[in-house]
């Protein structure tokens, strides 16, 4: 996902935080500690108040977005980025509904994950707790502010937000509404803050001790820059170079529908496919059926020699295989076998989401086991790689790293755990000497 503000400043030195930013971050952390003590009901009520305030400020938010769009058009922002920047009434109402739905999800906090008697009267439990304060750097996408803020409040975390500069007016209007809502709840409004300058977003990287996790949503270069310039843990949300492999044994109509949806349903999304891999035995029949469908959807196709021989008009370069288009462009390669498809995916994939279309169960299971991406699908669109569609309520990003959380990061990815041990004068020396023995008896959760 491109367009994140620091991506334009990757060669800049990281400045120290200003006194004003330090004060804001310190205040936010104090309020985040209070938020962590709020009850499930209080956090639910806070989300509903946020949704109400967004409804009340709907016209002001949409007007601010119009100003952002006009400025972006004058700057000739790419169509894919304009699509993300645009916040119409439907998108806004959907985001508001999403906040209300998030309030109804089970509480991710105070969940007992382990309950064990180490000995009589010495009881251990592991409880889910908030991370603390998260810093999220994201693209110029106003609806992301609402999703991330709501996830933060529901999971008991404070949030420092930085969107792409093209969305500054929209994000500021949205945050003002969210804070108005929080002011009518038990949660302090300053548990959320918005950074609007490049200098602030860079200085965020030096707020270790005040920020517990940074989630950058952007290019690999952005994620790498942040990892190299902060001591704060980083949860990388990088490029979405997703693949669809069409096996030789396949339901042709189904595969065409899945391919078109995976590319054209919303091409600016990171879970849209960028490369289509076709088994050589199915490629002629598939392309005969798919070329008109792609043309109707407005998709520009770029193919290797074999694909061009079957009707693809433009040639794909080596760079195409490694490109996240975020647009109605799709690269097509014809492969001799699934092994060749797996090799291509291993070389070029960003480990986001890969799909196989096949009717052969054994082939599907092998693909699902061999591909090391956050999401691996059979016979369905890559566009299902989404926190809302997974039933997470929303997502703060999609992690393409191997360590958890992986894939769409929802509420569960924004909590950690704490061990609590309750005793009655127990001392380690008694166990070291053999005077007492551990029982390690698991208790009901």
UniProtKB/Swiss-Prot annotation:
It holds the Pfam family Aldedh. GO terms for molecular function: glutamate-5-semialdehyde dehydrogenase activity; NADP binding. Pathway: Amino-acid biosynthesis; L-proline biosynthesis; L-glutamate 5-semialdehyde from L-glutamate: step 2/2. GO terms for biological process: L-proline biosynthetic process. Keywords: Amino-acid biosynthesis, Cytoplasm, NADP, Oxidoreductase, Proline biosynthesis. It comes from the Bacteria. Its EC number is 1.2.1.41. InterPro entries: Ald_DH/histidinol_DH (IPR016161), Ald_DH_C (IPR016163), Ald_DH_N (IPR016162), Aldehyde_DH_dom (IPR015590), G-glutamylP_reductase_CS (IPR020593), Glu-5-SA_DH (IPR012134), GPR_dom (IPR000965). It is found in: Cytoplasm. GO terms for cellular component: cytoplasm. Its main location: cytoplasm. It catalyses: L-glutamate 5-semialdehyde + phosphate + NADP(+) = L-glutamyl 5-phosphate + NADPH + H(+). Belongs to the gamma-glutamyl phosphate reductase family. Catalyzes the NADPH-dependent reduction of L-glutamate 5-phosphate into L-glutamate 5-semialdehyde and phosphate. The product spontaneously undergoes cyclization to form 1-pyrroline-5-carboxylate. This is Gamma-glutamyl phosphate reductase. The gene is proA.
